[in-house]
Regions:
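Glycine-rich and small/hydrophobic secondary-structure elements
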Residues: 1-17, 73-98, 119-142, 223-240
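Flexible glycine/proline-rich, aromatic-decorated loop/lid segments
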Residues: 30, 59-65, 170-172, 206-230
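Helix-loop-helix junctions that connect adjacent transmembrane helices in secondary transporters/permeases
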Residues: 110-177
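Flexible loop/turn segments at secondary-structure boundaries
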Residues: 1, 31-35, 113-118, 157-161, ...
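Short acidic (Asp/Glu) and glycine-rich catalytic loops that position anionic groups and cofactors
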Residues: 67-72, 110-118, 175-178, 219-227
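Alpha-helical support elements that line or immediately flank enzyme active sites
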Residues: 41-49, 77-105, 132, 136, ...
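Beta-strand segments within the central parallel beta-sheet cores of soluble alpha/beta enzyme folds
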Residues: 1, 22-27, 103-112, 145-153, ...
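Glycine-rich loop/linker segments at domain edges
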Residues: 6-90, 159-165, 233
Length: 240
């Protein structure tokens, strides 16, 4: 099975005297090995997430995938985002040092807020709470110099790219218990357990009163693919 893409890239990040980001220029190269596999979609995610959860005045992001005689690379946890986010966060730490402010402070000043627009055109909705999250860890970070690090990242969930996405579930009360039917495949990520927890939380019932009937497409509604970290988010909301 293909694993994570090896990445090389150049990230150039600029800011003003107050640490406010003025621009980001990225050039990303992915080694996809001997076969393309999912290099295209993975590279797309690496590029769209290379800006992180921050505001910018200007951005220019370019990504390239190339064949080599190495083993194939493809879909792997994080789907390209880990590589570009690591490069950006490392750059932010270096920039904070040059400006003379803390790594926490430069992230707080540039954090995306509700109503602001990410470089990919997405408007941050009311659930965006990056600044609140940074405030929650500020004391722990600043009271442990040299031992605690800090970084921010975002990751899409679901199929994305504007395609319709849906999840379905069916709940039946039988012999005093709730039977949960969903065709979502649990391949180790734990969605079968999460669905039961969501029913228990929503109804107030004990988990012993809820039974997950397993992924059986003959009796359960179509819940879509197990990919893109989407089952808990999409089918989970149907369960709720």
């Amino acid at each position: 099975h293909p694993k994570r893409h090896a990445m090389e890239g150049t990230f150039t990040l600029g800011c003003d005297e107050n640490g406010i980001f003025t621009g980001l220029d990225c050039e990303i190269y992915f080694d996809t090995g001997a076969y393309a596999s999912l290099c295209g979609p993975v590279l797309e995610r690496a590029c769209t997430h290379s800006v992180g959860p921050y505001c910018y005045q200007n951005t220019d992001i370019r990504g390239y995938g190339y064949y080599t005689n190495n083993p194939p690379a493809g879909a792997f946890r994080g789907f390209g985002v880990c590589q570009s986010e690591f490069a950006l966060e490392s750059n932010i730490n270096l920039l904070a040092e040059k400006v003379g402010i803390s790594p926490w402070e430069i992230r707080y000043r540039n954090a995306i807020e509700p109503g602001k627009v990410l470089p990919n055109g997405q408007i941050a909705d009311c659930s965006t709470a990056l600044k609140e999250t940074l405030l929650a860890v500020k004391d722990a970070y600043e009271s442990n110099p040299g031992r605690a690090g800090i970084a921010c990242a975002m990751k899409n969930a679901g199929v994305g790219v504007g395609l319709p996405d849906k999840g379905r579930a069916k709940l039946i009360v039988h012999d005093g218990r709730v039977e949960l039917y969903s065709a979502a495949s649990d391949i180790g990520q734990g969605c079968a357990t999460v669905f039961v927890q969501m029913v228990a939380e929503t109804t107030g019932l004990g988990k012993e009163k809820i039974r997950n009937m397993g992924a059986n497409s003959e009796v359960a509604p179509d819940s879509g693919t197990t990919s893109g970290s989407r089952q808990t988010l999409i089918t989970g909301e149907a369960v709720r």
